[in-house]
Amino acid sequence: MDTSRIVVLEGDETGQELLEQALRLLAPDVIGLELELPRFDLSLNSRRATDNAVVHEAAAALQQAGLGLKAATITPEGTDDVGSPNRILREEIGGTVIVRTGRRIPGVVPLGGVHAPISVVRMAVGGAYGATEWREVDGDDEAAFRTERIERSVCRAVAEFGFQLAERTGAKVFGGPKYTVSPVYEGLLKEEMDAAAERHPDVPYEPQLIDATFALLLSTSGDPLVIPSLNRDGDILSDLVLPLFGSIAGSESLLIALDERLMPRTVMAEAAHGTAPSLRGKDVANPMAMILAGAALLGYGDEQTQQAGRAIREACLEAVADGIRTADLGGYAGTTEFTDEVIRRTSQKLEVWSAL
């Protein structure tokens, strides 16, 4: 992984505008790092014009560099269109893990009393997505069938990364699949979670069935949690967890490919929101999630890069705590004004830290 190079994956509409704001935080005069930022235009027009060739080029560059920051993109509905760039990127970099983290934003009232961060670590491949489906007539009735597949290597990647993340953040690994009903299929993930727990004996581990995981989320709100999950379980769970914190503005999404040692080899970060076409060009959209995505990405670099990521993350949350907020969080700051303030605070933090 080349921590001095971040592949920039441009997107659509307000998603692209927010990416540009996040990139301002990565300038040398802000974080003191000379980063290479090769750019690839993954807007819908570019993907159509190149028949997705630009996406394949971006995937190759991402795989070589190891770090990528992606704007939100439009996925057209037609089956004969270019489809989702995320699917191509995921397949070509070998991404097996998706991590989405919900966290409290100062001054924003969460739902149900959740407090500490919750990270959902889900399979990026297999399961219900990509399953083979068909229907057959059965007398006067009709039957539907589906054949799903998950692999032990992917279960191991999800479990191991979940425990690594919990170890790094002081969280508890919580939850699990419905292995009592499906001991062969869903039990595969449970076996790998148990094995990862043995490799990380200092990480608190509380296995739960997936239905109990949903039910117990609010009552376990005092502890930071990491929840490894199957593909569809995690997709649904993250759609619940992120809004529980009152806003998804404090959440980023990471696609991760692991090496043979089960360590991150390639990481692509993006905001956990869409292209917000109605906000395009108005300078009112909240850039926080995109800025935090960039900060999270820096956390996979060397020590100096990690420090820059921490400074950006703290500056972002402290700005909100001091009342500098965009309209969606009840404030009056515009997109550029908020980013300006995060830049000022980030530079100030890094200057102070360098003197300690």
Name the predicted role of every residue range:
Residues 5-14, 68-72, 172-179, 295-299, ...:
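Short glycine-rich or small-residue beta-strand-to-loop segments that form or flank ligand, phosphate
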Residues 7-30, 140-210, 223:
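Glycine-rich phosphate/diphosphate-binding loop of Rossmann-like nucleotide-binding domains
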Residues 12-15, 66, 121, 162, ...:
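Buried hydrophobic positions in well-ordered alpha/beta secondary-structure cores of metabolic enzymes
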Residues 33-56, 217:
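N-terminal beta-loop-helix "entrance" segment that forms/cooperates
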Residues 41-46, 185-227, 231-239, 271:
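Active-site rim loops that border cofactor/substrate pockets in soluble metabolic enzymes
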Residues 46-47, 218-323:
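Glycine-rich phosphate/nucleotide-binding loop
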Residues 47-145, 232, 236:
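N-terminal glycine-rich phosphate/adenylate-binding segment common to multiple enzyme folds
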Residues 131-174, 179-183, 304-356:
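Glycine-rich phosphate/pyrophosphate-binding loop and the adjoining helix
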